[in-house]
Amino acid sequence: MLFRSAALSIANVKDCDVKIAMGIHAGDHAIYPDCRQEFRDADYKAFTEGNWDADRVGYFTPYLETDKLGILKDGLVLCQKLGLEFDEVYSRTNTSYKPFPSGNSDYKSASSVERIEAFIALGRPDPVQYEDETGPVAWEVARDSVAKVLAEYDA
């Protein structure tokens, strides 16, 4: 709601339409009900019915039907097109819902496991720094931990 309210204020002050980019993706649907298209539609309807000129604010959800691997593949293509270094860009991201005070990601929460799984499938190390209760860990530690979790889940 805060993003929508801020976006509507910007739209009204600058006399323009505003799009809110959302990173929700297919892997989120089962875990977070508010990431489903049905929720987004109902939420947007309530917003437009409750605010004048709210139709000036819209959502941009390019990954709604894409998993994290698809997002990474798109990121590779876009970084190449824009002349950006993929590892540099992705080293500045954080998927973890349980980051450490240092800012480093955990590698055991569901969101981190899903991210690491996507990097494993992509065949590249994740450039983000992972950490556990002992301190920062190498990519291989995070990767091997997630591979073990996935193997147990598939068993």
Language model: regions and residue ranges:
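Nucleotide-activated chemistry modules centered on ATP-dependent adenylation/adenylyltransferase
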Residues: M1-A155
